[in-house]
């Protein structure tokens, strides 16, 4: 199965119909294992039990940026390579990315209340993630507001690529500015600084949430393809009746 084969919506539907049940099962198993390991992880000597919010917050924060990266690649596919499923992939990913970003903001606020004494600070990292969330909502609104799918796809692709500028700002904001948010402790020069008792559950949860994204994304793409087919049939039927 090549990328050219996957450009065919019918073949894509056939392939994902076989793959999705296995992906869903793997996601459920890894989430269960990750949650179990997270529950057994010890309390931190400074943060206490609050540290366990990290096992939900960090994967969602990672995926909030990763999904926008996926949408940016799909946007290039729309504008440059004219891939038939590129705009489907971008449109299907946006609500999922918005959900991950929302969960990252909420869990970060829940962690910030006992650690910083407030649910919110206009910190560089927090503010840039909030901007990312608003950009997700803006793209979703754009797709719903424009009736012509081709025009909506092109406009959304341009805005997605422009919005990708925010990704390095989010990633390096803790290095560029004096922020309350802690620096990287997993993906960093010199290797992870986190103890294994926290690192292993975190990585399991990160893989589980990544599989969750893949599963939800493929399912959403299938729904979008089928929705467009139904709309096309309805338009054909309406034109026949008008004639």
Task: For the regions a language model picked out, list residue spans one by one.
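Polytopic transmembrane helical bundles with strong interfacial aromatic enrichment
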Residues: 1-243
């Amino acid at each position: 199965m090549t990328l050219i084969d996957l450009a065919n919506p019918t073949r894509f539907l056939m392939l994902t119909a076989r793959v999705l049940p296995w992906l869903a099962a793997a996601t459920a198993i890894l989430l269960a294992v990750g949650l179990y390991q997270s529950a057994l992880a010890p309390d931190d000597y400074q943060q206490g039990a609050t540290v366990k919010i990290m096992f939900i917050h960090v994967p969602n924060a990672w995926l909030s940026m990763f999904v926008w990266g996926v949408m940016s690649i799909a946007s290039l596919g729309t504008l440059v390579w004219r891939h038939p499923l590129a705009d489907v992939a971008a449109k299907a990913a946006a609500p999922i990315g918005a959900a991950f970003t929302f969960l990252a903001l909420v869990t970060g606020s829940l962690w910030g209340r006992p650690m910083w004494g407030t649910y919110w600070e206009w910190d560089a990292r927090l503010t840039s993630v909030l901007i990312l969330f608003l950009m997700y909502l803006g793209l979703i609104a754009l797709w719903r507001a424009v009736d012509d799918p081709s025009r909506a796809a092109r406009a959304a692709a341009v805005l997605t690529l422009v919005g990708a500028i925010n990704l390095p700002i989010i990633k390096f904001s803790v290095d560029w500015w004096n922020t309350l948010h802690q620096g990287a402790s997993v993906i960093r020069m010199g290797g992870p600084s986190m103890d294994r008792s926290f690192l292993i559950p975190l990585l399991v949860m990160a893989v589980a949430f990544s599989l969750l994204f893949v599963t939800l994304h493929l399912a959403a793409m299938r729904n979008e393809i089928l929705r467009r087919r139904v709309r096309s049939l309805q338009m054909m039927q309406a034109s026949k009746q008008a004639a």
